[in-house]
């Protein structure tokens, strides 16, 4: 497999369940393209010039969560993100495997990955 470069992109499929889709334009499924190398501080806005190589890391789920917050989330950020990661009560699956078995936010994304977010909390 080729080494990622700053211009390589990853195509990621994102799915929502348990009501989380309501925060994301009421769409259960999204497809996003993200850079394969991203800023170590998880900044998602384009900067000119791009960060130096020593300030980059492979795109991981933590970056994906920041990207979703900044570009897909339509309302009530506090229902999805807390302290830079997903809130407690949100189950995250990476290619049908619990993200806790994959390293949680440190999981390095690969082209074609599917990431599913399911809220296990329901109001009443």
From Swiss-Prot:
The PTM entry states: C-terminal thiocarboxylation occurs in 2 steps, it is first acyl-adenylated (-COAMP) via the hesA/moeB/thiF part of UBA4, then thiocarboxylated (-COSH) via the rhodanese domain of UBA4.
Alphabetically sorted, this entry's keywords are: Cytoplasm, Isopeptide bond, tRNA processing, Ubl conjugation pathway
Which of the residues bear the PTM 1-thioglycine?
124
Glycyl lysine isopeptide (Gly-Lys) (interchain with K-? in acceptor proteins): where is this cross-link? 124
Q: Which Gene3D superfamilies does the entry mention? A: 3.10.20.30
Q: Identify the InterPro entries for this entry.
A: Beta-grasp_dom_sf, Mopterin_synth/thiamin_S_b, Urm1
Q: In which pathway does it act?
A: tRNA modification; 5-methoxycarbonylmethyl-2-thiouridine-tRNA biosynthesis
Where in this protein does the record put region Disordered? 34-53
**Pfam families, per database record:** Urm1 (PF09138)
Main localization of the protein described in the UniProt heading: cytoplasm
Q: Where in the cell is it found?
A: Cytoplasm
Superkingdom: Eukaryota
A GO biological-process term: tRNA thio-modification
Q: Name one GO cellular component term.
A: cytosol
State the protein's purpose: Acts as a sulfur carrier required for 2-thiolation of mcm(5)S(2)U at tRNA wobble positions of cytosolic tRNA(Lys), tRNA(Glu) and tRNA(Gln). Serves as sulfur donor in tRNA 2-thiolation reaction by being thiocarboxylated (-COSH) at its C-terminus by the MOCS3 homolog UBA4. The sulfur is then transferred to tRNA to form 2-thiolation of mcm(5)S(2)U. Prior mcm(5) tRNA modification by the elongator complex is required for 2-thiolation. Also acts as a ubiquitin-like protein (UBL) that is covalently conjugated via an isopeptide bond to lysine residues of target proteins such as AHP1.
> Which family does the similarity line name?
Belongs to the URM1 family.
State what protein this is by name.
Answer: Ubiquitin-related modifier 1
Species annotation = Coprinopsis cinerea (strain Okayama-7 / 130 / ATCC MYA-4618 / FGSC 9003) (Inky cap fungus)
Q: Taxonomy-wise, where does this protein's organism fall, top ranks first? A: Eukaryota, Fungi, Dikarya, Basidiomycota, Agaricomycotina
Q: Which gene is transcribed and translated to give this protein? A: URM1
């Amino acid at each position: 497999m080729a080494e990622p470069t700053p211009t390589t992109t990853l195509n990621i499929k994102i799915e929502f369940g348990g009501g989380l889709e309501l925060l994301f334009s009421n769409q259960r499924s999204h497809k996003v393209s993200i850079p394969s190398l991203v800023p170590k501080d998880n900044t998602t806005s384009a900067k000119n010039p791009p960060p130096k190589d020593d300030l980059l890391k492979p795109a991981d789920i933590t970056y994906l969560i920041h990207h979703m917050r900044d570009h897909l989330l339509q309302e009530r950020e506090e229902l999805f993100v807390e302290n830079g990661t997903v809130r407690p009560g949100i189950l995250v699956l990476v290619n049908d495997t619990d993200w806790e078995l994959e390293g949680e936010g440190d999981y390095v994304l690969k082209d074609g990955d599917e990431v599913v977010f399911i809220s296990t909390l329901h109001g009443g």
